[in-house]
A protein has these predicted regions:
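Short, acidic/polar
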Residues: 12-25
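Structured beta-strand-rich core segments of catalytic domains in phosphoester-bond hydrolases
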Residues: 36-114
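Metal-dependent phosphoester/phosphodiester hydrolase catalytic core
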Residues: 114-120
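Active-site beta-strand/loop signature of hydrolases that rely on acidic residues for catalysis
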Residues: 3-7, 23-41, 106, 135-137
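Active-site environment of divalent metal-dependent phosphoester hydrolases
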Residues: 11-14, 38-41, 117
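A long, amphipathic alpha-helix that forms part
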Residues: 121-137
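Short, flexible loop segments at the rims of nucleotide/cofactor-binding pockets, characterized by
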Residues: 6-13, 85, 123-125
Length: 137
């Protein structure tokens, strides 16, 4: 199984720069994208643009910010994708998607940045602590 992860810093920009060609060339089974910067409402227009793949979106609550997406081969019929960790503080920013397959779980995560002035350090530490507890259970 080929799994690729990529912080794209914006869905529209990476699409125009050749995401379809990248997917065609490397043919990942799972492609995890972080920082998609598109909300779920806008994302649905893109959902059928990659033949042979399904796209699972987890956009942030505000457009132009954060979010994750999983692009999965359609032949992965036993794939289950869950958006979020069950904590609205983190889930509203679209930070985590959980892929469940018969043999393993795979987390597509966009980790928080503490910021230049460390203004979001507490948030980042809270996220990391919550994620560790989530994975341990």
């Amino acid at each position: 199984m080929k799994i690729i992860t990529w912080n794209i810093n914006g869905w529209r920009a990476i699409w125009q720069k050749g995401l379809p060609h990248f997917v065609e060339r490397y043919q990942p089974d799972l492609l995890g994208l972080q920082e998609i910067k598109i909300n779920n409402e806008l994302a649905t227009a893109w959902s059928d643009k990659l033949p042979g793949y399904n796209i699972f979106w987890h956009g942030a609550w505000r457009p132009g910010y954060g979010g994750t997406a999983i692009i999965a081969k359609q032949n992965l019929t036993n794939l289950r994708v869950t958006n979020g960790l069950g904590n609205d503080l983190f889930d509203r920013e679209g930070r985590c998607q959980i892929s469940e397959l018969p043999d393993f779980y795979w987390l597509n995560i966009y980790f928080p940045n503490a910021g230049h002035e460390l203004e979001r350090l507490d948030y980042k530490q809270s996220f990391n602590k919550y994620l560790r507890q989530f994975v341990a259970n």
